[in-house]
Design a protein with these regions (language model features):
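Active-site region of the double-stranded beta-helix
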Residues: 1-73, 87-188, 192-194, 199, ...
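Conserved metal-binding segment of the jelly-roll/cupin
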Residues: 71-89, 201-214
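Structural motif
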Residues: 84, 188-190, 215, 224
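Conserved small/polar residues in nucleotide/adenosyl-binding loops
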Residues: 236-243
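Gly/Pro- and small hydrophobic-enriched strand-loop and loop-to-helix capping segments
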Residues: 246
Length: 246
């Protein structure tokens, strides 16, 4: 982001269905890169009520009660529907999300466009959509393991793992009824499927594997490779990511 993005929230499925005949939006962030001092906002730093929320929006102090984090590459945030959030200037984020376009913009720092107009806000719609729960820490903690996938998020809408690798890895998707997306965040690798199709993937590129893919082999081109792997739903009956690789 070149500038701070708006403070916003997404509704959960039931509210989105009632209001928009749509699904809600749960998402996650993986910090690919960050300028020095770049920040993200996720959740509330103190307990507030819907009434106080409305007052703070009106007097431009809503950011005072949002939890703010100075970020670095590799940081992960899970954002279930209802959690207020925003991306700060200087943050380069890979975002995995539920398929939905429903966003309630709460606060946009009173910015105006070239015509002197402010952006539309949805503060009243957001009030009912917000989860006002306060957590001690909104970051997702994990420990990277070399040459093994590490699961970051598993929710009803998607599962995401990170690969930090220098050695070749094979992945078994024979029991997975979903497409798979790989996002290359660092280095370069070759991905070859069970039918012999092979493609080079460089940093900043993504590849989508169809649901018919049975297995793939990932071979680093040179040096260290970092990949995000994500698929559409959480299959709790499947082997863990580590058990699906060899």
């Amino acid at each position: 982001a070149k500038q701070d993005l708006s403070i916003q929230v997404h509704p959960a499925d039931d509210l989105a269905k009632k209001r928009h005949n749509s699904m809600g939006k749960t998402e996650m962030w993986y910090v690919v890169d960050a300028d020095k001092g770049a920040k993200l906002r996720s959740g509330f730093s103190e307990q507030i009520t819907p009434k106080e929320y409305k007052e703070r929006v009106l007097n431009n102090t809503i950011t005072d009660v949002l939890q703010e984090y100075e970020i670095k590459p590799g940081d992960v945030f899970f954002l279930p529907a209802g959690r207020v959030h925003s991306i700060g200037a200087g943050a380069f984020i890979a975002e995995i999300q539920q398929t939905s376009d429903i966003t309630y913009r709460i606060y946009d720092f009173n910015r105006k466009d070239a015509n002197g107009k402010t952006r539309e806000l949805h503060t009243d719609l957001a009030r009912e959509a917000i989860n006002y729960e306060v957590l001690d820490d909104y970051r997702t903690k994990y420990e990277a393991v070399k040459d093994e996938p590490v699961e970051l998020v598993a929710c009803p809408y998607f599962t995401t793992s990170v690969y930090d690798m220098t050695e070749e890895i094979s992945c078994d998707y024979s029991e997975l009824d979903s497409f798979v997306i790989f996002i290359c965040m660092e280095g370069a690798c070759r991905i070859k499927d069970n039918e012999g199709n092979e493609l080079k993937v460089d940093a900043g590129e993504s590849i989508l594997l169809p649901a018919t893919t049975q297995d793939v082999t990932i071979t680093p081109e040179a040096g260290n490779v970092k990949l995000l792997e994500t698929y559409a739903v959480s299959y709790t009956h499947l082997p863990s990511p580590r058990d699906r690789t060899r």
